[in-house]
From Swiss-Prot:
InterPro entries: Iml2/TPR_39. The gene is iml2. It comes from Neosartorya fischeri (strain ATCC 1020 / DSM 3700 / CBS 544.65 / FGSC A1164 / JCM 1740 / NRRL 181 / WB 181). PANTHER family: TETRATRICOPEPTIDE REPEAT PROTEIN 39 FAMILY MEMBER, TETRATRICOPEPTIDE REPEAT PROTEIN 39C. GO terms for cellular component: cytosol; mitochondrial outer membrane; nucleus. Keywords: Cytoplasm, Nucleus, Phosphoprotein. Residues 177-202 are annotated as: Disordered. It holds the Pfam family Iml2-TPR_39. This is Inclusion body clearance protein iml2. Its main location: cytoplasm. It is found in: Cytoplasm; Nucleus. Inclusion body (IB) resident protein that interacts strongly with lipid droplet (LD) proteins. Involved in LD-mediated IB clearing after protein folding stress, probably by enabling access to the IBs of an LD-stored soluble sterol derivative that acts as a chaperone in inclusion clearing. Belongs to the IML2 family. Signal peptide: none annotated. Residues 186-202 have a biased composition (Low complexity).
Length: 719
């Protein structure tokens, strides 16, 4: 069988880095992608056959995917070890490639300096190691993660500069050729073309030499520290180290080139381009999403995200038919069907425009998902994404149906995700028994937040207890017993998992809630289930933003469930203080907002915000009420804008709005500007709020909302 190098060069190549890179990339292309088809054994077996840097990285990526899907400590340790091995191997191969760059038969990329593919392998390993480190329970590992992140950035920045320079030279060459061909004799045009080609080659060589210096030793502490102050993930180049050099923004024209473009004829260039766009895109996107308290820390050390550019780079990476393209597609679908659906204030969509990446480009997402389902037909991972997309577009019944089939994924982490998503969909649909059973199944499949799983299972049986309390005492007793059983189990497993050495937010929430109910039960001399306040399932639906996925009928069902608290069936309502009553109003306001009844929603929120905030502070109290009420008020104001269009197909449109504002265009703009101004005021208050329970979770919404407001202001400047 012919080797790839022989086919490319016409004769048997010498053993050099470039031909080895080509051979290794082709060898692992199919085995590596098997992980995205739920065939982990096939992926591991195929990757075990080689010892190259690319095979080492492939094994690390497989472990990384499993680690990020399941958050299990043993898998994360395995991923960390494999990625470290890949990073070390890549460093050795990079130096060898640079040393042997002038050997016969060596491939010389028109864009990248020798050894760039190995520098990218290091950056990928460093980035994935950083993510695993942040997910690790150790604070030390989390700190090390940021150091790896800095090193990866420097490498990726250098690679993108090569692409930028190549595109600039290509445009210059084209411009000179078109200019000379129109007014100069053919002999002179030929001479001019040669001169331009020679000049361009010399310039390109200088750029490659300069960037090769950066890539040669990206791990040196002195180099990292010197460049730290200049780090920026906003899509612009760092401050030039040479005073005479003027930094220019990274050119985006290369993102318009598809995989069949002439500049991607070599597999090494394909790997470098798709890989660097994926990695840098992930960096830009993740850092743009962090909560306000954490983003301040990142900005101090020079990290600033750019969501729009990050998404464009991920979309570009997803075009390529390799492992990186598949992972990029998974990241894109996860972002839009997960994060975007979790947030309530997002930038306005631009209908029919491919460049619209910050809204919810539904048609584009459907095409991407269809392509992935075709590439990986056996994978439950993409079926899971189809379910998420259905839920995001207010078709929860279809979303649940997709996850209730008999087929199971052989990959435990994917199966755990499937059951978890099924649990959430059942919760949104008020299918309590299915929800409880599914969350209990999660306990056996995943160890990430078992306290939350038990808590929600207990809450489901509490709802069933309340439903039959006055009509079937036997069933009521059974559900009360199960509810108390799972409630008592929840705090016993809380705190087992940590994120950056801190307890998981919902673990803290669950432990406090149980302690609060237990104290009330003793004080009121009632059972634990009768000491519970506002429906905890409705509270969970709110925290997981289930209302955005629900139809009007399903939202009305939530209102009916909330009405139980004030009904005669609730014998403890007269004992409730302002805290539980505020939670009831807040949850009702959230449902009314989703029903587009903003006047009623704001009235309820104003009543909460008019109270003394100290009423909601103290031991065992829900201190999240006021900051969340501020965010909810901001969301109502944002949705009241005349130009607001929800980012999903099941949304009500302008004709269904409670109020679309003034009809006159000038008055409408002024009305919208006023809505945005007030929205921003409430968001700023929420962002500056003191530490409170679940602040990191709510902070994600606040960060996304502030970015959306800033984008609106940039497109609607005041005269």
């Amino acid at each position: 069988m012919f080797r790839v190098g022989s086919w490319l060069y016409g004769k048997k190549p010498a053993a050099n880095a470039s031909t080895q890179s080509l051979d290794s990339l082709v060898e692992l292309r199919d085995p590596a992608t098997l992980i995205l088809n739920d065939d982990v054994d096939g992926a591991e077996a195929g990757l075990a056959e080689g010892t190259s840097t690319f095979h080492n990285l492939g094994r690390g990526v497989v472990a990384f995917i499993r680690a990020t899907l399941g958050f299990e400590q043993d898998i994360m340790r395995q991923a960390s070890e494999r990625l470290n091995e890949a990073e070390t191997s890549a460093s050795v191969d990079q130096h060898r490639a640079q040393h042997n760059s002038h050997a016969p038969n060596t491939y010389h990329s028109p864009m990248y300096s020798p050894g760039t593919e190995f520098a990218l392998c290091q950056a990928i390993a460093q980035l994935m190691s950083a993510i695993v480190g942040v997910l690790n329970e150790s604070l030390t590992e989390s700190i090390k993660a940021f150091y790896r992140l800095r090193k990866a950035y420097i490498t990726l920045d250098a690679i993108l500069k090569m692409e930028q320079k190549y595109m600039e030279e290509s445009r210059s060459a084209t411009l000179v050729e078109s200019t000379t061909s129109g007014s100069v004799p053919s002999s002179q045009r030929h001479s001019s073309s040669n001169l331009q080609s020679s000049s361009s080659s010399i310039s390109s060589a200088k750029v490659k030499e300069a960037t090769a210096d950066t890539l040669a030793a990206p791990s040196k502490d002195t180099d990292v520290n010197e460049r730290l102050a200049d780090l920026s993930l906003s899509g612009e180049a760092p401050v030039a180290e040479d005073p005479g050099q003027t930094p220019t923004p990274i050119n985006t024209d290369i993102l318009d080139h598809d995989p069949d473009s002439d500049i991607f004829q070599n597999q090494i260039d394909v790997f470098v381009h798709s890989g660097s766009n994926f990695c840098f895109g992930v960096l830009l996107l993740l850092i743009s999403m962090v909560p306000p308290s954490f983003s301040k820390l990142l900005s101090i050390i020079g990290f600033h995200g750019d969501k729009e550019r990050g998404l464009k780079m991920l979309w570009q990476a997803s075009k390529f038919h390799n492992l990186i393209g598949g992972i990029a597609a998974f990241a894109i679908l996860g972002y839009y069907n997960g994060f975007v659906r979790y947030c309530d204030i997002m930038p306005d969509s631009i209908p029919g425009k491919d460049g619209d990446v910050q809204g919810y480009p539904q048609k584009r997402l459907e095409l991407l998902l269809a392509k992935m389902r075709e590439r990986f037909p056996k994978s439950q991972l993409w079926l899971l994404e189809e379910s998420r997309m259905s839920g995001a577009n207010k078709n929860l019944d279809r979303a649940l149906e997709l996850l209730c089939g008999e087929e199971r994924s052989p990959l435990k982490q994917v199966e755990a995700l499937r059951v978890f998503e099924r649990s959430l969909n059942a919760m949104y649909l008020h299918k309590y028994e299915l929800c409880a059973d599914s969350f209990l199944e999660c306990v056996d499949l995943n160890s990430w937040s078992r306290s939350l799983y038990y808590y929600i299972a207990g809450s489901c049986h509490l709802s069933l207890y309340r439903d039959v309390k006055e009509t079937d005492s036997a069933k009521a007793a059974k559900h009360a017993e199960l509810a108390e059983k799972y409630f008592r189990m929840a705090p016993t497993v809380a705190g087992k998992k940590r994120f950056m050495a801190r307890q998981l937010p919902f673990d803290v929430f669950v432990a406090r809630k149980f302690a609060k109910w237990e104290a009330r039960a003793k004080e009121w001399k009632v059972s634990l289930v009768d000491a519970v306040g506002i429906d905890p399932i409705e509270e969970m639906i709110f925290f997981w933003n289930g209302h955005s996925r629900m139809t009007d009928e399903q939202l009305q069902e939530s209102l009916q469930k909330l009405a139980w608290s004030e009904s005669n069936a609730n014998t403890t309502w007269s004992r409730e203080g302002p805290e539980e009553k505020a939670i009831l109003k807040l949850l009702r306001a959230a449902v009314h907002r989703s029903l587009r009844k903003h006047t009623q929603a704001k009235e309820m929120l104003e009543d909460i915000l008019g109270q003394d905030r100290t009423l909601f502070k103290g031991h065992l109290k829900d201190d999240w009420i006021c900051p969340v009420a501020h965010f909810e008020m901001a969301a109502n104001l944002w949705m009241e804008r005349p130009t607001y269009i929800a980012n999903h197909s099941g949304a009500k449109q302008d004709s269904d709005k409670e109020s679309a504002g003034p009809a006159d265009a000038k008055d409408a703009l002024q009305y919208e500007r006023e809505r945005v101004r007030k929205c921003k005021e409430y968001l700023e208050k929420a962002a500056k709020w003191e530490s409170y329970e679940l602040d990191a979770r709510i902070g994600l919404k606040v960060t996304a909302a502030m970015e959306a407001v800033q984008k609106w202001e940039s497109t609607h400047p005041t005269v």
